[in-house]
Amino acid sequence: ALYILMIVFVVYTIIKNNKFWSWGAAATIISQVASYLPIALGIGGCIVLTGTDLSAGRVVGLTAAVSAILLQRADLPNRIMGAFPELPAGAAIVLAILATMVVGGIVGFINGFFVAKFKLHPFIVTLATQLMTYSVILLVFMLGGNNGQPMNGLRPEYTNFVKGTMVEIGGAALPWYVLYAVIFAVLMWFIWNKTTFGKNMFAVGSNQEAASVSGVNVFKTIVMVHTLAGIMYGLNGFIEAARLRSVNQA
């Protein structure tokens, strides 16, 4: 019934607005979906474990701030890392990607550890880490005399790497981060469906006791799922900072 309603809605919209079914509209929809696909892939693993992750948005915000700090232009008067020399664009981008993955992975590891070790519900654990992560964000925005101001002035190499035009179809541009989102989706599909870790994840999500009896390391699996989710949030933060060209505390 839901699919029928969706089809009816799409057909009605096309009839009432002929611009809905256009390359421009399709490119906009694809770009919007791709910009949030990494965070969805991360939370997907947590949902398979019959849990959730309320800290996802804040981790994206924190890692976006990390990306902005590392990739601000050197000529900015209020550059947070003003005392440090500007790295070559390629090296700075790689460093930012690694930094966001590490920061996101650490938060994810903390989530997974407390969920697995103390048998706490993910809702409670991730609510706590959400608040703690936001506190860290507020502190980060006070660094270098920034005084809580939005971080902008990002290097053009960074924004082009993420938001530059990958291809034009019918006059509508698709940015590079659409390709990155597809790569992440394929990678996560492979991990979930073609690896022992993925099979263990589904086993733990179905029945932890049965999985444990079958020889699955439940603790390790839960921690790894949340850590992987955190890494995906970090990559989403890297994309989001460049996509918006600015990062704020919200």
Regions found by a protein language model. Give the residues of each.
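Alpha-helical transmembrane segments within multi-pass membrane transporters and channels
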Residues: P77-Q130
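Helix-loop-helix "hairpin" substructures at the membrane interface of multi-pass membrane proteins
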Residues: A92-T100, V107-N111, G170-V247
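Structural signal for alpha-helical transmembrane segments and their membrane-water exit/capping regions
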Residues: L5-W21, L49, I137-F141, M188-T196
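Helix-loop-helix hairpins and the membrane-proximal interhelical loops
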Residues: A1-A34, F238, A242-N248
